[in-house]
Amino acid sequence: MTAHFTDRPDPTRADARLAKASTWNVGTRRRQRAAVDAIRKAWAGREWPHPGLLSYSVYAGEDGATLLHYSQWTGEHAYQDFVREGRDLRNAEIDAAVPGIERLELHTYELYRSGLRAAGDTRQTGCLVIVEAEFDGPDPARQRAWVDTVFEALGEAAELPAGGIAAHFHVSTDGTRVINYAEWESAEHHIAALAAPGDGVGSPSPRWERVHDYPGMTGGGGVHRYTPALSMEPGVGG
């Protein structure tokens, strides 16, 4: 079973019990490109490492320095097996090609709620927007209640902003974080949606004020835009 390269993962796939997300700081756009090439080579040249790994995707940060890694797993045991048996060889090859990569925190998530693309919508995801929210302590009920509050605020709009495709809210298994994995046609569409007068995404309203001022939020996190760089899954027949 080898890697099959695809255009994007499916965050809503039913067999994905967990998602892992982390960031690498590689420093420059040139090193971003070199790291993506090294990742592709390291994975294409080996057997798929574990049947419990359902997809692995890499996104290039708009900042020209970072790479976001998003992977889907059948469960934590599958990930731990991969760490023991398959991660080091790949990372060693990547590090040899691009020395000095800074690997930042890895977080584990479960998909909680999605705003899905409409039936028949075949638009390509040209920009991934990650919106992070952090809370002052573990509270799974609070995570989910905050996401529900976001959906209530989004429900005020008659339709998605131009260029918006889908939003997938993930809650961390430690109870302290939420990310919105938001698919957009382009970065320009997302920028325009934020800047839209009066009714832009997150514009002042009682419901959006509840989102921004939710009890226990630390003010950490932020909004980050990425360009899809690489996505893969097990080959057919594996």
Give the residues covered by each predicted segment.
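Short S/T/G/P-rich N-terminal loop/turn motif that feeds into the first structured element of a domain
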Residues: 1-67, 74-238
